[in-house]
Amino acid sequence: MSERSMLEKIGCFLATFVLYASSAHGDVLRSVQEDAPLPVQETRISFADLGSGALALQGAQSTAALHFGTRKDEAVVGATLHLRLTYSPALLPELSHLRISVNGQVVAALPLPRADAGHEVEREVVLDPRYFSDYNEIRFDLIAHYSLECEDPQHSSLWANLSPSSDLTLTTRAIDLRDELGLLPVPFFDRRDNGTVVLPMLFATPASRETLRSAGIAASWFGMLADYRGARFPVSFDALPAQHGLVFATNDSRPRQLNLPTVDVPTLSIVDNPRDQHLKLLVFQGKDETQLRQAVEGLVLGNAVLTGASATITEVAHVRRAAYDVPRWLSTERAVKFGELVDSAAQLQVAGIAPPPITLTLRLPPDLFTWNRSGVPVDLHYRYTAPTERDNSQLTVTVNDQLLRSYRLTPEAQSGGDGRFDVPFLQGDSSRQSRGLVIPAFELASTNQMRFQFAMEYHRQGLCREVFTDDSREAIDPDSTIDISSFSHYAALPNLALFADAGYPFTRFADLGETAVVLPDAADPVAVEQLFFLLGRFGRQTGAVSLAYRLLDTQQALTAENLDLLILSGPKSNELIAHWGQGLPLLFDDGQRRYRDKEPNAEVKVRASGSLGALLSFESPVTSGRTVVALVGSDDHAAAAVSAALGDDSKVPLIRGDLTLVRGTDLQSREGSHVYFVGSLSWWQWLWFHFSRHALLLTLLCLATAVAAALLIYGGLQRLAARRLEPRAAE
């Protein structure tokens, strides 16, 4: 064998060895990645974050509970309660204790020593994670005694309070979910999670307006699902998110960090996030922008029938919504039953002698015309366990924490005592009480809380004769109704309160069919995030998807006829508003801020280094009777502050008038001087409403009408008398 041949064989062997070693090393790395432990995170949730104030326990056997969910892509592996507890000094430590249970399983019984009574103490309770499920209840039962002999089970000394600053620390481990469209909207939205929905959106650079419009439709759908939680949609261009996210791509515009194939039809798919294999990406794809929109519409309209790791959309068809066809607003076409306003009839029922209130959320059309009306009629039916004697048991009805009516709960009529009774058939129930009441118009806003508080009086039987059985049941009948069908739609604008609270006038069409959103710069992530935030908020307010809105640039806005305009922040938006609004109260123009105050009639121009944001509303210069709402600011921080103010429910009541200034977390509003009206009234309503605002003119009109009528009557009588005299004159 020659030396050359030997060297070739050795080289071949070494090359084979290196390739094998590299392959083996790659297999080991893949194995390590696949076998890597699932990520674990620790979350601390206060009782206040769970929607609870202080938990007050009153009586010998009182109960309070917390409710929360566990995400489908997480499993609880550890849980600890940190309680801040205050209890009565009168409790006997030998008999009294606080019992804690998780989903019906008792996990702890805390003693209540006298030495710690009367002031706040801290207790830590470790909970067994095996007891947790998708929906969880942590229940607190106070077992309280103040005497070794006869007791009053409702004695005022039997109490304990859990502070809202108490918290629950959850340790959760991620669960790998399969690539399955049938799980949607999980994991991108999980109704078990009560926190704000944060859902990143990924685009290639640059993203076209039509692509952003399609993404906005998806944002409105997720905002509708998020509801009270709120939703934010961080935007990234060619940068993978560090959590579950959405991807929007066409064949000509695909994010660089994803190896997406080209497609010929609208396609939906779920894939692993290359940044973290435990995270998922929902990918919307189309050959072009039209197909991309069809893919998004296929999700929001047909998610109930999606299965598998991917799906193609073959056809999408939908009709435009009519005005005021808004799922989350009370219908103006008919009376609405209370049962339609809750998810389950169980939400209209309570138990106990001091139960929590039954609460209904009433969302009215913001332009409901209630002028010169006594109010909104309610046909109320309710049931309750009748007290044994006439006492102070009552049902109190409030609207927005204002007392509306209070009804005495009376005993049932005495029966013959033979033990016989009628089984109710359909609505025939002898214990049912019916009341007609009217909610005063001045008590109502766009969003209202109507509460029904039952309070049953406890009867003390005497010393050592107490047998406490708290088996009272109370309910509001689901067939109770509220009727706004006789009201017209008419509103005075500009009024930013209607926009902040209900998205009006854009949400008058639930699909935003007469709305144009003006996006000044499609490459500006701040403006794009503002777009998605607002569309998600509209979805929350209407309960519908924004399928029909238009997305324009500032040049197209100049000719946007017969549309309400929503202008997003950006330098070009400031230029557009400056072009339109020499009479507007605030302008950002050429680095200056021009502010015009109506009281006194003055104008000032300033240059300032700090951030200033604003919400501005005025009548559209393009089409009279149409509305412009603009979110403007001096910089990106100001734009973010405006969005944050709209997303903070505690700040929304401060937004009103035609201008709201936003300086950090401080809001200041003012009322405009130029008012215009939208909607329609019957001719006589229009006449009386507008003349009522000018009392002197109305008086003069009435006098003129009376004089004209008198002259007409006088002239008619004169002619009638002349006809009667004509025959006599002829004779």
Residues covered by each model-derived region:
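N-terminal secretory signal peptides that target proteins for export/translocation
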Residues: M1-E8
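Bacterial N-terminal signal peptides
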Residues: G11-A21
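Sec/Tat signal peptide C-region and signal peptidase I cleavage site
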Residues: S22-G26
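Solvent-exposed alpha-helical segments and adjacent loops
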Residues: D27-E731
